[in-house]
Amino acid sequence: MPASTARRLRVAVLADSDTRWKWGALTAARISSTEFTETTESTEKSDKTADSDIRLDGFLLRGRATPTVRQLKEIGVRADSLREVTAVEFLREMTKETYDVLVLALVGGGVQAMLHGLAHAWQGRPERPVVVTGYVGVVYEKLADGLLLRHGADLVLANSRQDAERFRAVYEGVGADASSVTEVALPFLGGAPYEKKDPYTVVFAAQPSVPETRKDRSYLLDRLVRHARRHPEREVLLKLRSKPGEHTTHIEELPYQKLAQRHDLPANLRLVYGNMGEVLDRTDLLVTVSSTAALESLHRRIPTVVLTDLGVREALGNHHFVGSGCLASWDQLDAGHEPTPDAEWVARQGVAAGSTPSGEGSYATAFGEARERVAELLTTGELPPLKPYYTPVTAPGYLPGVLARHHLAPDGSPLPGAPVADKAPGPVRQIVRRAARGAYRHGVQRVAPVIRRMGEL
């Protein structure tokens, strides 16, 4: 926002998981505050998100992936207020409070439900916030589905030039307004440029749902163990996203912690948690299947490998890295291979500022267009009603189900009996809620794999 802004902006973020809260809160700061125009230090290591330019109110959508206290602490992003809400409770809050900017950091169906719910809640209201949404990382699946579910926001953020081109093509291809697509970058990139460490440290960034099968996940763990034994002079870290019983953006049926119990791990191999930026501070080689951590690593010019052992496949997401120069196998890594990323490919992903021959891709200015668009919309006065592409006319067999999952009718109004919490839950309700979540996670991580294996007999 312009430095001349006379008052502190009020910004709200609604998120449904730990990673989306991190993306949403940091995005809100970057598109609303001049404090983030020039940044060289890691944003992940700083909790300076709710700075003097904005008041940030966080809302965590109640569900299977609602972040735990530990996960929120690990992210390290500070807000002026943060509380858990149901979808209907959040919509009610949006009719009581006045915000300048609202960031919807949700899965696609959640964004669509909130857009329709907000359109209904704000009927006849002369003013409303600028509504922003986007993606938390690499977009490698369900491109059309996810994009059309996000259509209707004032800004649909694309994390790279490549994504912006793809997003506009999808919207224009179905006859939807593509003017909302705005190119930015991932908001959590940063940190000091890479310098070789002693001891040399290899980090495998695990993912909750990729790969999916026990066989493939066991294979990757076995290769990591073999690499550690082959290179006893190296420190080898298995970077885990969540602890057993916790959920993140994706469901993890087979945690690596559980698989690791069957191994006699070498002394130089450790399982670690914590902030990804802090782990990258001590990384010499980042290895992953397709994690967004690869982009964080590339931004800091850390040698980065995207594994090909299980194939280069859309189901794994590593097809996104074709042309990056980072594709390699464990056999190559065991032999000492270090990849050299393609500068043009990296620049198109919105990372590694100034790494291209032409000097394009400045990360410091990556959010300038979004800030300008937000400022322009805030000064236009009354904004038009939200108009998503999906309506009861364009998607009569799809939209009602998307909205019903969030207890909303096809017109965006709350369904009868929709859960709403007008006050903080009492001790009994908190115990019941924790038990219900525990039962769900037990079903996902214990019962579902057994049933799946029985079905394969």
Show where each model-derived region lies:
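A short, charged/proline- and glycine-enriched loop
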Residues: 2-11, 53, 194-202, 457
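Active-site and donor-binding regions of nucleotide-sugar-utilizing enzymes
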Residues: 9-34, 47-48, 52-57, 61-177
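Conserved catalytic-core segment of nucleotide-activated headgroup transferases in glycan assembly
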Residues: 23, 189-256
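Conserved active-site histidine-acidic residue motif and adjacent donor-binding/catalytic loop
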Residues: 84-87, 270-278
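A nucleotide-sugar donor-handling region in carbohydrate enzymes
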Residues: 152-217
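Nucleotide-activated donor-binding/catalytic signature segment of Leloir-type glycosyltransferases, i.e.
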Residues: 252-274
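A donor-sugar binding/catalytic signature common to diverse glycosyltransferases
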Residues: 273-316
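C-terminal amphipathic helix plus adjacent low-complexity
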Residues: 334-457
